[in-house]
């Protein structure tokens, strides 16, 4: 796996970012161990969190040995795009995942993030795969349009909406003496 950041995961909540790092690290570690047991050598997949809580030491460490998956906030993504050395690490990004997108889509933070995503796409020189996640999106089409953005001619970009909601069947019985 070439050095550089390939996936950017954005969440509005720093605590969620730390949880996501743990939730990604364990399965990746398990996959690497299982592959090794089968005699298959897989490349290391590095995961890092960059937020306002990230120490200067950790930021320098990321410059020397960049993560493949960067977990960040909208504000830290914007700052990363403005930092010349770190910006260079973002040139390989192919995928951006926006979690809790419902929280961002209709806010100033969301407008700022939309601009950062366009800047990131311009930096990479290719269309990014954009993935939005939420358990409470409504209406789906409006949020999808927010994430997909628009072409230079003002036309909305194509996107695919996957509605993974399901109706939970509840069986309630009242038993009274």
Tell me what each language-model feature is:
Residues 1-3, 39-43, 61-65, 86-91, ...:
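Conserved catalytic network of the ASCE P-loop NTPase/AAA+ motor domain
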Residues 1-20, 35-36, 123-127:
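Conserved SF1/SF2 helicase motif Ia
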Residues 13-17, 22, 53-56, 75-78, ...:
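Conserved nucleotide-binding/hydrolysis micro-motifs of P-loop NTPases
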Residues 16-49, 146-153:
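Conserved helix-turn-beta segment of the N-terminal RecA-like "Helicase ATP-binding" lobe
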Residues 44, 53-70:
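Conserved motor-coupling elements within RecA-like helicase/translocase cores
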Residues 70, 74-78, 84-126:
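SF2 helicase catalytic motif II
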Residues 118, 129-177:
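Conserved interdomain linker/interface between the two RecA-like ATPase lobes of SF2 helicase motors
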């Amino acid at each position: 796996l070439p050095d550089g950041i390939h996936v950017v995961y954005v969440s509005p909540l720093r605590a969620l970012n730390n949880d996501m790092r743990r939730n990604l690290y364990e399965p990746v570690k398990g996959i690497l161990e299982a592959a090794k047991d089968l005699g298959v050598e897989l490349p290391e997949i590095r995961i890092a969190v960059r937020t306002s809580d990230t120490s200067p030491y950790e930021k320098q460490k990321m410059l020397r040995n960049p993560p493949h998956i960067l977990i960040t906030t909208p504000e830290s993504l914007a700052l990363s795009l403005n930092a010349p050395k770190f910006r260079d690490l973002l040139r390989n990004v192919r995928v951006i995942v926006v979690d809790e997108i419902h929280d961002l889509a209709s806010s100033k933070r969301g407008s700022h993030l939309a601009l950062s995503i366009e800047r990131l796409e311009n930096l990479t020189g290719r269309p990014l795969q954009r993935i939005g996640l939420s358990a409470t999106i409504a209406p789906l089409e409006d949020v999808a349009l927010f994430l997909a953005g628009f072409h230079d001619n003002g036309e909305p970009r194509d996107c695919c909406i996957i509605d993974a909601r399901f109706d939970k069947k509840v069986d309630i019985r009242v038993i009274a003496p």
